[in-house]
């Protein structure tokens, strides 16, 4: 205080950004999906586990950590509190005690204070900042305690509190306390001493916390209306609430000024670009760029704090970073609260948030106390400035920044009086609305942001109530997909009905309706593309329902269920496990999230006359790899150009990026009716590309027995539906290219170890290609990859034929067959991919610089050097090891029997030939009574014996083939058992032991069943053979 009285500049205080993390409970959608918690917390440390790999664990430590996931209950007032004394649950009061009080302390001392809420959409940012119902968040609690403290000190100081609320969307600033919107948004100006500020932003003087609470409600309503009209989700905008707090100490002629900024940042998943690398318009949206630039600023400041050389801090790259310049690396005490989802399906986003917070805590600020000892001189100068209408105020002392914002409004008392008059008018409107809520049925808006749900109420008066885009309608909606005359609600005889007009899209409880439909209390209604409302019936129909369960997710899940979309459609739990696969759940969540976005994109395409139809698909929904295992599923969007039939496939990330750009173009169209854009900048256009249509699986077991294979196999698309039929031949051959015959068939594939194998893959034809039926100008190519080839081989393009003949052969050679290659042939399929060509697209073709060729010019396979697997001691899985040894001995015995039977077959063949050429009297067969039939009988028996011999050989070959296939699987399981190591985490030992026990049991069952099956088959074959070896009639 002495230095302040002497007029000296206060000494800056260096502080690091304080970082807190908070883990929310499961959402209803996550509960319904059976999500698992992947986060644990100990003191201030957060540990996150990869749901796909339990051994991959990462730990982070922060200044503050709050566990709000479980261990809570509601008290009689609806406040969430710990369920028992041992619970580690942190409620709203705990968060405020550490963070909110810190903000207040800084403000009273004269420091600027900033609070940033960061996290993915739905992670609980708004709940921590504002809260819901009785569980008030940081912002209302800060305001309440600020005015309570002012009241206690009103005798010794004069306190002035001013409030503003703004939104940043697409690099435009909207004043949420002003009902008029400036064209292009408010502008950010820069002053040499003041830094960046928003020109023309409305500041409202406040004298109690109730007034601020109502201003927040007013701002939320304007924000909701604006986002509806602009088709802009609030999750993609930043909301900034600012409080200017000025203390005038009456006894010391001293002032302290503090700026409190509380920012609810846009959903952090929006900045991620992974998966959109192939998009030529990558990061084209300014919505994406603002959070990306914020990350760049934080990274640069973190590097600076660590002593690295940083040439430039990119504050000027976005509106958001300009306004947060003082909060990050400047004159402010800053806290960042990172909101986390604990669900396994949100693992990637949660890990990204933790890493972001880890960088932020390295940023260092230099906060100073904002004081001015010359308050009287300041007021005199301010009066002089007001005489000039406030012109040139920005060029004067920084001590007058608050007065500069006031402009010509007059004294503080006059400002308060003006605010009271405005408040009284708003209060009368709010009171009238609250009275109507009690007596009239109405529609309650439901938004993706829970903070904006219930902000809009549309009352359905007696008679007919029209809904549409036109201003003459009783309910005017400017949102996407709303017609001028969209639908009508009728309130008559105690019943409310809804009837869509000809072009109006109306969905009730997930189902589209086309005729007048009676509404029941709590019915869910979607108008147009995605304007969601909850119908609140007459007072007599209402009860003590929990309206919170009808959230945005509920609407979308209901809509998906009506369209037949469910987790079961994507695949259920793993065998022996009741829990659904986390990757399947994540795909399902992505599908639900993208559903409304695709509907909106189609509507924009229609209104902008772009002629695109977008459909949500699941990549690899019914696809498998060469071993028959399911491929990783992901959501994609199929885009079709109506008229030209051009088709594109967009990844999830690419579609989201394009959707941002579509919104920008659509907004420009709404404002100026101009949607013209250069083709290369058009988010609705892409160059044509090659598309993957489907895959066919050709199993290679026959090659391991040197048997020819000729098949017609279906090409199945990602949904498991037939796209075409493949005619293919796989022929084992000699090094000269001659096909092997039956005499070259190998019963035991192990005989091929270390030997050379040659084979040819001949793709003959594709039949009934739907891609070509739809448009005769299209073409196809086929691609496949054999074992360890470094690249895929493609056939030549074939155009304009529904049944295109390919007729391409490739000769392959394995010079020394390895056990791994043999196992590949026994257990894998050749996956042939069908690719669709469009007019103007480039053909598929890959150079083969790494492919090895034999001296004859054939492609070499099985060229890898395999590392041997370490042997294990006999005491590791000893029982199975002994069984495997015994099984190998019995297998060798069966091979001996097989060799003896083959020798006997040769002898019988020779004896049969001798019997056919010997005189009739010398034949071993009994002479029949009919001499003429003797020759016929002998010949018939000879044919029968030959047929039986061939049948026995083929049956034995099949039996051994099945047995060796089972043994290959058993060897693979044994290798996996040998390679398994117990986890270091004690908590994972029980699942590990359970998994190992199950694997041992499966292997034991496989060995036992394979052996019994082989014994049974061989016994049956030997019995049948002996029956035909015995002389007939003896």
Swiss-Prot record:
- Organism domain of life: Eukaryota
InterPro entries named in the record: FHA_dom (IPR000253), Kinesin-like_KIF1-typ (IPR022140), Kinesin_motor_CS (IPR019821), Kinesin_motor_dom (IPR001752), Kinesin_motor_dom_sf (IPR036961), P-loop_NTPase (IPR027417), SMAD_FHA_dom_sf (IPR008984)
Q: Known SMART domains for this protein?
A: KISc
Matches recorded under PROSITE patterns:
KINESIN_MOTOR_1, KINESIN_MOTOR_2
Listed Gene3D superfamilies: 2.60.200.20, Kinesin motor domain (3.40.850.10)
Coiled coil ranges (UniProt) are: 875-904, 994-1027
Q: Which UniProt keywords apply?
A: ATP-binding, Coiled coil, Membrane, Mitochondrion, Motor protein, Nucleotide-binding, Transport
Any one biological process term the GO annotation gives: organelle transport along microtubule
A single Gene Ontology CC annotation of this entry is:
microtubule
- Write the protein's name: Kinesin-like protein KIF28
Organism name: Rattus norvegicus
């Amino acid at each position: 205080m002495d230095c302040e009285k002497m007029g000296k500049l206060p000494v800056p205080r260096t502080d690091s950004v304080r970082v807190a993390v908070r883990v929310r409970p499961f959402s209803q959608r996550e509960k319904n999906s059976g999500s698992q918690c992947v986060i644990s917390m100990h003191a201030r440390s957060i540990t996150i586990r990869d749901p796909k790999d339990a051994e991959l664990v990462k730990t982070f430590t922060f200044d503050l950590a709050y566990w709000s996931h479980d261990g809570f209950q509601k008290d009689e007032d609806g406040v969430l509190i710990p369920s028992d004394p041992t619970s580690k649950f942190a409620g709203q009061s705990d968060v405020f005690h550490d963070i909110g009080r810190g903000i207040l302390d800084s403000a009273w001392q004269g420091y600027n204070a900033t609070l940033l809420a960061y996290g993915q959409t739905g992670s609980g940012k708004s709940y921590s900042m504002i809260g819901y119902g009785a569980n008030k968040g940081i912002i209302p609690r800060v305001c309440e305690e600020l005015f309570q403290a002012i009241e206690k000190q009103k005798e010794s100081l004069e306190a002035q509190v001013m409030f503003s609320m703004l939104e940043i969307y697409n690099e435009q600033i909207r004043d949420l306390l002003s009902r008029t919107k400036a064209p292009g948004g408010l502008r950010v100006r820069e002053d040499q001493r003041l830094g960046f500020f928003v020109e023309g932003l409305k500041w409202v003087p406040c004298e109690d916390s109730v007034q601020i609470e109502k201003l927040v409600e007013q701002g939320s309503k304007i924000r909701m209306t604006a986002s509806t009209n602009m088709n802009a989700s609030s999750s993609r905008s930043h909301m900034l609430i600012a409080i200017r707090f000025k203390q005038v100490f009456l006894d010391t002629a001293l002032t302290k000024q503090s700026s409190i900024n509380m920012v609810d940042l846009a959903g952090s998943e929006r900045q991620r670009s992974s998966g959109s690398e192939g998009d030529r318009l990558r990061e084209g949206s300014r919505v994406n760029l603002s959070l990306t630039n914020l990350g760049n600023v934080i990274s640069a400041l973190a590097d600076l704090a660590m002593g690295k050389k940083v040439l430039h801090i990119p504050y000027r790259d976005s509106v958001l970073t300009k306004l947060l310049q003082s909060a990050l690396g400047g004159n402010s005490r800053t806290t960042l609260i990172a909101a986390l989802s604990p669900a396994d399906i949100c693992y990637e986003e949660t890990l990204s948030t933790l890493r972001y917070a880890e960088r932020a805590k390295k940023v260092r600020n230099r906060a100073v106390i904002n004081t001015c000892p010359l308050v009287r001189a300041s007021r005199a100068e301010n009066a002089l400035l007001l005489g000039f209408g406030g012109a040139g105020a920005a060029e004067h002392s920084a001590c007058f920044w608050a007065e500069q914002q006031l402009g010509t409004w007059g004294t503080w008392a006059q400002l308060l009086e003006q605010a009271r008059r405005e408040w009284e008018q708003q209060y009368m409107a709010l009171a009238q609305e609250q009275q109507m809520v009690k007596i009239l049925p109405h529609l309650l808006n439901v938004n993706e942001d829970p903070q904006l749900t219930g902000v809009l109420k549309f009352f359905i008066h007696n008679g007919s109530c029209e809904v549409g885009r036109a201003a003459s309608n009783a309910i005017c909606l400017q949102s996407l997909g709303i017609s001028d005359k969209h639908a009508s609600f009728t309130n008559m005889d105690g019943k409310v009905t809804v009837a869509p007009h000809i072009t109006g899209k109306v969905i009730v409880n997930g189902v589209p309706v086309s005729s007048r439909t009676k509404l029941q209390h709590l019915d869910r209604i979607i108008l147009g593309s995605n304007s969601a409302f909850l119908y609140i019936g007459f007072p007599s129909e209402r009860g003590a329902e929990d309206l919170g369960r009808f959230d945005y997710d509920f609407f979308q899940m209901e809509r998906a269920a009506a369209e037949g979309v469910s987790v079961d459609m994507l695949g259920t739990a793993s065998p022996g496990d009741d829990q659904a696969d986390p990757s399947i759940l994540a795909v399902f969540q992505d599908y639900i999230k993208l559903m409304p976005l695709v509907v909106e994109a189609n509507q924009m395409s229609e209104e902008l006359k772009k002629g695109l139809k977008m459909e949500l698909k699941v990549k690899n929904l019914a696809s498998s790899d060469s071993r028959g295992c399911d491929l990783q599923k992901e959501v994609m969007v199929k885009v079709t150009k109506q008229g030209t039939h051009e088709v594109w496939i967009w990844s999830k990330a690419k579609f989201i990026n394009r959707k941002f750009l579509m919104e920008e173009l659509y907004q420009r169209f709404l404002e100026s009716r101009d949607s013209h854009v250069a083709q290369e900048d058009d988010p609705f256009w892409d160059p044509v590309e090659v598309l993957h249509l489907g895959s066919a699986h050709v199993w290679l077991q026959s090659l391991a027995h040197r048997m020819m294979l000729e098949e017609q196999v279906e090409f199945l698309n990602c949904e498991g539906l037939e796209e075409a039929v493949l005619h293919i031949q796989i022929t084992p051959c000699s090094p000269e290219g001659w096909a092997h015959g039956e005499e070259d068939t190998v019963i035991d594939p192990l005989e091929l170890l270390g030997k050379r194998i040659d084979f040819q893959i001949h793709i003959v034809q594709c039949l009934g290609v739907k891609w070509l039926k739809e448009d005769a100008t299209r073409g196809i190519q086929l691609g496949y990859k054999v074992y360890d080839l470094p690249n895929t081989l493609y056939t030549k393009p074939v155009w304009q034929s529904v049944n295109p003949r390919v007729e391409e052969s490739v000769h392959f050679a394995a010079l020394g067959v390895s056990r791994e290659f043999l196992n590949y042939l026994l257990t894998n399929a050749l996956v042939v991919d069908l690719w669709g060509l469009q007019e103007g697209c480039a053909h598929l073709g890959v150079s083969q610089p790494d492919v090895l060729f034999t001296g004859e010019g054939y492609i070499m396979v099985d060229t890898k050097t395999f590392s041997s697997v370490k042997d294990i001691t006999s005491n590791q899985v000893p029982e199975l090891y002994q069984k495997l040894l015994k099984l190998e001995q019995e297998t060798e015995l069966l091979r001996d029997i097989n060799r003896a039977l083959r020798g006997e077959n040769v002898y019988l063949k020779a004896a049969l030939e001798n019997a056919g050429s010997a005189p009739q009297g010398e034949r071993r067969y009994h002479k029949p009574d009919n001499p003429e039939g003797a020759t016929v009988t002998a010949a018939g028996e000879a044919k029968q014996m030959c047929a039986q011999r061939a049948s026995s050989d083929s049956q034995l070959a099949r039996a051994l083939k099945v047995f060796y296939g089972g043994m290959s699987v058993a060897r693979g399981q044994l290798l996996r058992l040998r390679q398994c190591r117990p986890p270091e985490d004690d908590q994972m030992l029980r699942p590990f032991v359970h998994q190992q026990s199950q694997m041992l049991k499966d292997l034991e069952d496989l060995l036992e069943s394979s052996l019994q099956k082989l014994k049974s088959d061989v016994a049956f074959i030997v019995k049948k053979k002996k029956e035909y070896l015995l002389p007939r009639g003896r």
